[in-house]
């Protein structure tokens, strides 16, 4: 598996397709949108895991206290349950480095505070 330093450049358009097919059933990205099964991801970058107001996180997510940035997301999205044992997220992860890079590029654009 490619490390973050070896990750390909991300394509936000391709990442949006990945988000719509693999993430949108549980997450929203728009400011003010409510939580679904997973938390709203607006303002994700620079936020500490387990801290979105109004969402009931697992103790594992709160205790991990990772700051979400590109490298952390790249590693997390490979295998969420390995990165944060005990997370409630049921998504198995994205094995392809390009898919992870694309999704991160999309999230960086779509979750930035406006």
UniProtKB/Swiss-Prot annotation:
Matching entries from PROSITE patterns are given as:
CYTC
Record keywords, A-Z:
Acetylation, Electron transport, Heme, Iron, Metal-binding, Methylation, Mitochondrion, Respiratory chain, Transport
Record's subunit section = Interacts with CCMH (via N-terminus). Interacts with CCMFN2.
Q: Which GO terms describe its cellular component?
A: cytosol; mitochondrial intermembrane space; mitochondrion; nucleus; plant-type vacuole
Q: Which PANTHER family match?
A: CYTOCHROME C
Does Cell inner membrane show up as a keyword for this record? Answer: no
- Organism, as annotated: Arabidopsis thaliana (Mouse-ear cress)
**What are the leading ranks of the lineage?**
Eukaryota, Viridiplantae, Streptophyta, Embryophyta, Tracheophyta
State the protein's purpose: Electron carrier protein. The oxidized form of the cytochrome c heme group can accept an electron from the heme group of the cytochrome c1 subunit of cytochrome reductase. Cytochrome c then transfers this electron to the cytochrome oxidase complex, the final protein carrier in the mitochondrial electron-transport chain.
Kindly list the positions annotated as binding heme c: 23, 26-27, 89
**Mainly resides where?**
mitochondrion
Q: Which residues carry this modification: N-acetylalanine?
A: 2
Q: Which gene encodes it?
A: CYTC-1
Is Coiled coil set as a keyword in this record? no
Indicate what this protein is called per its UniProt record: Cytochrome c-1
Origin: domain of life: Eukaryota
């Amino acid at each position: 598996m490619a490390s973050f330093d070896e990750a390909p450049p991300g394509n936000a358009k391709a990442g949006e397709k990945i988000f719509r097919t693999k993430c949108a059933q549980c997450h929203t990205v728009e400011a003010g949108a409510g939580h679904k099964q997973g938390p709203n991801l607006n303002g994700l970058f620079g936020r500490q895991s387990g801290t979105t107001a109004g969402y009931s996180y697992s103790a594992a997510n709160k205790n991990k206290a990772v700051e979400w940035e590109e490298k952390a997301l790249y590693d997390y999205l490979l295998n969420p349950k390995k990165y944060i044992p005990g997370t409630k997220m049921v998504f198995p992860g994205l094995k392809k480095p390009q898919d992870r890079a694309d999704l991160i590029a999309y999230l960086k654009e779509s979750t930035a505070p406006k």
